Amino acid sequence: MSKKGRVLVAMSGGVDSSVTAVLLKERGYDVVGLTMKTWDYSTSGGRDGKEVGCCSIESMNDARVVATEHGFPHFVVDLREEFGDWVIERFTDEYLSGRTPNPCVLCNTHIKWDALLQRADDLDCEYIATGHYANVRYDDERDRYLLSRGLDRNKDQSYALWGLPQEHLARSIFPLGAYEKPEIREMAAEFGLDNVADKPDSYEICFIPDNDYPRFLKDRVDGLEEEVSGGTFVLSDGTVVGEHDGYPFYTIGQRRGLDLALGERVYVTDIDPETNTITVGPKEELMEQTLTAHEINLVKYPELDGERPAWGTIRYNDDGAGCLAWQPDEDTLKVAFAEPKRAITPGQSLVLYEDEDVLGGGWIHEVGGAENEAAERAAEAPA
């Protein structure tokens, strides 16, 4: 057994996870590689034989080659059933409820970490590691494990990890959090990872590699297209201005693909699944200053006592804005931003930061409705 300990590394077959595994081995850890097969087209509503990215045979073979060439064991685990139940079902249900889901957060919280920790225990591994650009450390004063942004702000993935509880963070290692992406590609070349060093980054949803989520929903839900077609576009005053293809195929803030000639640019400002109605309007009608989030997870503190200044983000790659956050009950966060935010979208993640640390997060449930006075105080609070 290595003095550093035994670590189970999630390996997708990409450059980040491959460098993570080899870097930890170079640092003296006893490394075990694990590739998780989470989906295929036959079980997730698509066409057989079209797997690409992290669940393709090529990617699994790339991970195996890295492990073999660097002398550590590698395993593959089939998580398609769990992924389908937790991620794909909720993804589908959220769109059918008029919300816009974030499947990566669900996968990290309920699939990847649960599966990694279970297999880590089976393989006598003390730690798990991934190629996420984030950092974790133990804070003696708070007696808590803290999650913080990665050094490379362009690649920072702390937003997608807000749902990890303390017991998961306690066993997690993120070696790439201290590096920028160009350094990782340089390391890949230095380590001789020729099969992955120049692989392009992946930005699409892993189980929708063509990024066509309306097509995915139509493939997955029998009769959906016929059921929801013929809905109406309306203005905020109720004036009907056109027909649409069905409410699940649109998202808050969308402008392209509306096929409306109204003499000005309009955006989706509201989605009503009950009436199959989509409200459109000018950009100004997308601006909101308050929100409510549920299913929360607090990282830096066990609970929030009163209003706390924070930096709030409402989607991946959102620059964020100063805000006040408070916790009216165990499972709810309310947030008032110092200035109105564009297209706050139910179903997306709210993530709060305090300096570089993740304060906590939750799923955006309701937009507006929080106290106007709180928004005024947020404008005066330190960012």
Curated annotation (Swiss-Prot):
Cellular location(s): Cytoplasm
Residues noted as binding ATP in the record, renumbered to the chain: 10-17, 36, 131
UniProt cross-references to NCBIfam families, sorted A to Z: PRK00143.1, trmU
UniProt lineage: Bacteria, Pseudomonadati, Rhodothermota, Rhodothermia, Rhodothermales
Annotated segments matching region Interaction with tRNA: 155-157, 315-316
InterPro entries: MnmA-like, MnmA-like_C, MnmA-like_central, MnmA-like_central_sf, Rossmann-like_a/b/a_fold
Protein name as catalogued: tRNA-specific 2-thiouridylase MnmA
Site (Interaction with tRNA) location in chain: 132, 348
Keyword Transmembrane helix part of the UniProt annotation: no
